[in-house]
Amino acid sequence: MAEVKVPELAESITEGTIAEWLKNVGDNVDKGEAILELETDKVNVEVVSEEAGVLSEQLAEEGDTVEVGQAVAVVGEGQVNTSNDSSNESSQKDEAKEKETPKQSNPNSSESENTQDNSQQRINATPSARRHARKNGVDLSEVSGKGNDVLRKDDVENSQKSSSQTAKSESKSQNSGSKQSNNNPSKPVIREKMSRRKKTAAKKLLEVSNQTAMLTTFNEVDMTNVMDLRKRKKEQFIKDHDGTKLGFMSFFTKAAVAALKKYPEVNAEIDGDDMITKQFYDIGIAVSTDDGLLVPFVRDCDKKNFAEIEQEIANLAVKARDKKLGLDDMVNGSFTITNGGIFGSMMSTPIINGNQAAILGMHSIITRPIAVDKDTIENRPMMYIALSYDHRIIDGKEAVGFLKTIKELIENPEDLLLES
């Protein structure tokens, strides 16, 4: 017998939530094989077994919060012949547990409910499917499988989605026939638990707002020259760098590095009574995912060329959306860039990332009339840029100077190429 424990994660992570069991009780487990997926404050990680054998016990359920070092499963010796057998065995164990658990008497209970409970027990389903059904009030007798003898968690989830869509359509048809009074307090709402990562993000954003003297300064950038350079070099860049595309993000990343070198206080953070000025340039690139906004870091941007930065950004974006980011991708950065322009944002005041002094916000490129000199007005592609910064560390003069440096480098992109 060997216990599987939650491994040491990043220094700041002490616990996580079991997102999904990847193995059921009775399943064969190889050494180094993942048995569950753990959701942490930053990324999802897989917990693996250090021993080969059979998963004999799950010590926590999906949705439970577990601490680093806590035992979550037991792997014993032996083998199971088929996956169906293991699922049947685990289902029988669940069934036995349910029979052993005394039910509280309820004067309102009916024979039909008891019949439903018994039918739930007779149905062959994996433990995770049963738990999910109990948690969400799904009747397993109404769940259709995928041709297997055993109902699995995804079968229950698919049944939920189908029921939800039916309920929505029924609700719409009912509402179309009658209007609720504006004074009626029972308006339709949907209440659901926030994911661990969503709760953590909400907590940290509030902490940053409350614990920093955050201020935002703005400028505008004429994107004419950088767009022209990108257009001229785009095809050759793709050929020279194995299909890597030249985007605007690499220009802003290199401009940020140059500005950070010129204004080192922007690359700093406060630690107690000390100010730590970082001598490295790990730039966070905000990526939107189904789980919310994630900020993986491109390491050593001062040592990377445009192609390497673009490749790294593309790789991190794919990993973020596929939930494959590691903890090393998400910690110990020095500065962050976020681009609300991809969603159509014209202007915003981004919130500083934790343990940093500032964040740069990019926005939509909008063609508008600009006075290029006192006698000439031309339509130019313009972008508003924003720098939110911690006024405890950075004075207004430095913040404005930093943003002005970004502006000048983007408007004269050849200077960035020379620096690279």
Swiss-Prot record:
InterPro entries: 2-oxoA_DH_lipoyl-BS, 2-oxoacid_dehydrogenase, 2-oxoacid_DH_actylTfrase, Biotin_lipoyl, CAT-like_dom_sf, E3-bd_dom_sf, PSBD, Single_hybrid_motif. Residues 75-201 are annotated as: Disordered. Its EC number is 2.3.1.61. One of its GO terms (biological process) is tricarboxylic acid cycle. Gene3D superfamilies: 2.40.50.100, Chloramphenicol acetyltransferase-like domain (3.30.559.10), E3-binding domain (4.10.320.10). Residues 91-102, 149-158 have a biased composition (Basic and acidic residues). Its cofactor is (R)-lipoate. The active site is at H391, D395. Residues 81-90, 103-127 have a biased composition (Polar residues). Binds 1 lipoyl cofactor covalently. SUPFAM superfamilies: CoA-dependent acyltransferases (SSF52777), Peripheral subunit-binding domain of 2-oxo acid dehydrogenase complex (SSF47005), Single hybrid motif (SSF51230). Pathway: Amino-acid degradation; L-lysine degradation via saccharopine pathway; glutaryl-CoA from L-lysine: step 6/6. The modification N6-lipoyllysine is found at K42. Residues 159-188 have a biased composition (Low complexity). Residues 1-76 form the Lipoyl-binding domain. GO terms for molecular function: dihydrolipoyllysine-residue succinyltransferase activity. It catalyses: N(6)-[(R)-dihydrolipoyl]-L-lysyl-[protein] + succinyl-CoA = N(6)-[(R)-S(8)-succinyldihydrolipoyl]-L-lysyl-[protein] + CoA. Residues 124-160 form the Peripheral subunit-binding (PSBD) domain. E2 component of the 2-oxoglutarate dehydrogenase (OGDH) complex which catalyzes the second step in the conversion of 2-oxoglutarate to succinyl-CoA and CO(2). Forms a 24-polypeptide structural core with octahedral symmetry. Part of the 2-oxoglutarate dehydrogenase (OGDH) complex composed of E1 (2-oxoglutarate dehydrogenase), E2 (dihydrolipoamide succinyltransferase) and E3 (dihydrolipoamide dehydrogenase); the complex contains multiple copies of the three enzymatic components (E1, E2 and E3). This is Dihydrolipoyllysine-residue succinyltransferase component of 2-oxoglutarate dehydrogenase complex. It comes from Staphylococcus epidermidis (strain ATCC 12228 / FDA PCI 1200). The gene is odhB.
